[in-house]
UniProtKB/Swiss-Prot annotation:
InterPro entries: Rhodanese-like_dom (IPR001763), Rhodanese-like_dom_sf (IPR036873), SelU (IPR017582)
Entry's family note: Belongs to the SelU family.
Assembly, per entry: Monomer.
Name of the molecule in the record: tRNA 2-selenouridine synthase
PANTHER family (UniProt xref): TRNA 2-SELENOURIDINE SYNTHASE
E.C. designation(s): 2.9.1.3
Pfam entry (one): Rhodanese
Length: 364
């Protein structure tokens, strides 16, 4: 076990999806964590705040003493049992705190007293975070090919089929548009960046990588924004544009936003609450672009959406949604994307239907 006492090969740890028992406070974990980490705090948020205040006013020794008073007795035992259970579940795991300092060492010592020798990450989360940032910058220097196309062109599916494809929207838990949110909440910015870095490292390690294949995205995907080093490279990258018939795009959008999202909401929350959540999801997506539509047009499309929802609820048919989706594409989404694409016209290297783009990618 001695060779695992302190881990410094941070890239290997990230590549292996190494389980991390993260003993930072919940607020720290929410602000940024590594994939595969579970949060089992040594101190809760209020306890950490009290210790921090004590440290500023009375110094390190007083703060340490306060920490031991706050985490003692039954509280200490409950947390110790949770760490023991986590290590038994993940015997190849590591303890991790902010910088590999007192918190992970204290938990390590308490576990050792029970006969468990759990190694820790030297440098803690901060060291892993810096490794992730550096890896993203380094790997973003490789050539990039973008997949473009109007909403409903099947771009994400095409990216997912590529061995060198990186599903940015999947990593962000958002499909990019005002209707793009999923049932899984988005990660914090730092956690998204960490997850992206690990994905890049894994794909790069699996093959001799000539280039990345990414979807043509804006600066932000929902609440997450792309790392600037990657965004700068994407702005200069060649683009293959999917140009599918409008009717085919509508069918993809029907399946994704009306059939699948309805299923996901009702599966998660039950029929009644799921239907309410699904309805609110569609209304929220339309509301988010009300100013760009103009308030009168927004009101008209909202009325049409209400009628479509009533029809879907009574008959199960999603046909009524086409009455607001078609004008939304024609008046808003398609003109917006085409305007953005025109500014990058010099970067376009191929155009064609979905299957032609897929075949072209294979030939590259």
């Amino acid at each position: 076990m001695q060779d695992r006492q302190k881990a410094q090969d941070y890239r290997a740890i990230l590549l292996a999806d190494t389980p991390l028992i993260d003993v930072r406070a919940p607020i720290e974990f929410e602000q940024g964590a590594m994939p595969g980490a579970i949060n089992l705090p040594l101190m809760m948020d209020d306890e950490r705040a009290a210790v921090g205040t004590c440290y500023k006013r009375q110094g390190a020794d007083a703060a340490l003493a306060l920490g031991h008073r706050l985490v003692c007795g039954d509280i200490r035992q409950q947390r110790l049992e949770a760490w023991k259970a986590a290590y038994q579940r993940f015997p190849n795991g590591y303890l991790c705190c902010a910088r590999g300092g007192q918190r992970s060492h204290i938990v390590q010592r308490w576990l050792q007293e029970t006969g468990i020798d759990c190694p820790l990450i030297e440098g803690g989360y901060k060291a892993l975070r810096q490794t992730a940032i550096q890896a993203t910058w380094q790997l973003a220097q490789k050539p990039i090919l973008l997949i473009g196309g109007c909403t409903g062109s099947g771009k994400t599916q095409l990216v997912r089929q590529q061995p060198n494809g990186v599903d940015l929207e999947g990593l962000a838990r958002h499909r990019g548009s005002s209707f793009g949110r999923t049932l899984n909440p988005q990660l914090s910015q730092a956690s998204f960046e960490n997850k992206l870095a690990v994905e890049l490292l894994k794909i790069n390690a699996r093959q001799t990588l000539k280039r990345w294949v990414l979807e043509d995205e804006g600066r932000t995907i929902g609440a997450n924004h792309l790392p600037e080093c990657l965004r700068e490279r994407m702005a200069q990258a060649p683009i293959a544009v999917v140009e599918d018939p409008f009717a085919l795009r509508l069918e993809r959008l029907r399946e994704e936003y009306f059939i699948r999202m309805h299923h996901d909401f009702t599966h998660a929350y039950g029929d009644e609450a799921g239907w309410q959540a699904y309805s609110e999801y569609l209304h929220h997506g339309l509301f988010a672009i009300r100013r760009r539509l103009g308030l009168q047009r927004f009101a008209e499309l909202t009325d049409t959406l209400d009628r479509a929802l009533a029809e879907q609820l009574s008959s199960g048919s999603t046909d009524g949604h086409m009455a607001w989706l078609v004008p939304l594409l024609n008046e808003y989404y398609d003109p917006m994307y085409r305007y953005q694409l025109e500014k990058k016209a010099a970067n376009i290297v191929f155009r064609g239907p979905w299957q032609d783009v897929a075949n072209w990618l294979k030939a590259q």
